[in-house]
């Protein structure tokens, strides 16, 4: 299939310029600018996609989407409420839990932690926490064995490993709210929970029945944890679930606790896209300078074409293709660089961290301790199209100027 005449002449002009050594500094800078802008935008969007994936896999998969807690603690008639809650449309699973704060001790090392009493069988339906417990510890996690599963950050702080024993001090319940000596319980570290994030440094789990025994709660619990089919509708669903409990309850969802992370990711993605589009735009508009110089350089050729009968539309199309090809080269280079870096972003950052001896994301501050990346080809397509559209826009003025050249004046040497 033959190429359009305008594209063919545009390619000839472009190749001729390169053979003649007329590649201007502005043209090189604009091409490099487009390539860098496209590459950085693809890498940045891939990093944001990675953060969103890890938020879903490491936060939304392990924390309850919603929680219901009785105003009057402990919650004694929770079984009836649980039956009602499980029938609410949109609730995928529900399970009782007990929450309390404890001080865990090993030798001279102390650590304050949030302890959660869970039913091992029901927790597997509620969250993905069991899959983050190292080894097969969850399979042997059961009540009556004085077991505890602690986060890896807690284990490192206490210098303990799976199989060691720790002591945990638990607040002693007193109906008159008098200050009493805390209860001390000796527990066996049954497993280590590794989420590579903030929860590793402050979280532990024990079987629900053991928690009820340690806290003298009988068959009562602190609340009911919920898993929802639509996590972004959590506020409404947890409200619906709270209404069917027939009790005075507090309700909360992951949106109130971790929702800021999702909002921040979306905001940073939008800001990054806007900033990089502006960078690409500045680089593309350097094409204007390049093409204006090219129009002046090729004015004799334009005059000959006009003399041979070329219309204004053909002349415009030639220089639009001329500018578009320059933008296309920079864009394709940027896409190749961006895709390669995005696919290897995590190991690249890990190598840089080892090289400089500094970790960019600390797990005791952020919800993950590595820089994730997930390449979406639709993002690559949008970035490429945006860069080409800006190149096309930048080519229009010089192309229009080329079509207005008077061949008689050029050929007469005026």
Curated annotation (Swiss-Prot):
Primary gene name: lolE
Organism: Escherichia coli (strain K12)
InterPro entries reported in the protein's UniProt record: ABC3_permease_C, Lipoprotein-release_system, LolCE_TM, LolE_gammaproteobact, MacB_PCD
Cellular localization per UniProt: Cell inner membrane
Membrane-topology descriptor: Multi-pass membrane protein
Record keywords, A-Z: Cell inner membrane, Cell membrane, Membrane, Transmembrane, Transmembrane helix, Transport
Record flagged with keyword Membrane: yes
Pfam families per record: FtsX, MacB_PCD
Name listed for the protein in its UniProt record: Lipoprotein-releasing system transmembrane protein LolE
